[in-house]
Amino acid sequence: MTEYKGVASGILNGMELEVRCFPDPVLKKPAEPVEEFDGELADFVERMRAAMQAHNGVGLAAPQVGVSRRIALVEHDGQSFVLINPRLLEQRGEQTGEEGCLSFPGIYAEVKRPAWVRVEACDERGELRVHEVEDFLARAFLHEMDHLDGKLFIDHLSPIKRGMIRTKMRKRAAAR
């Protein structure tokens, strides 16, 4: 993966961003912080948004499109969040719900997560924001933030369930 100016090469030349699927190694690599907030970053965020919407996703993290940077997007019920260099400040409660992932097409599993979170993150202009979200949005924020740490939703599952999903995804990858 060739990188420049804190984002990635090729993002401005009209190439469509491709969602990477497990077992692509970029998905397990902790992402690097974003250091430059400029027009290239804003363009990349918009290209990520287009890729997420094209796949009917609720969230997308930069590693899912092959860019190892701490950038994530979440959209739900008309709300849109850009999370750059996010940091979990506080969490409360507990919820269990079904999760899916664009990097695991057609795979869903019950995952336990906090019910409420406070997250600090920059937007694409570099402005620091604090988001307090609950229920589904808390789940989506944490799912995308996990991607930035090289953690996948299947890592929250029992070893047996995780192994079954890994095997299924590896077979799919081999068939491509």
Write out the residue ranges for each language-model feature:
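Positively charged
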Residues: 2-176
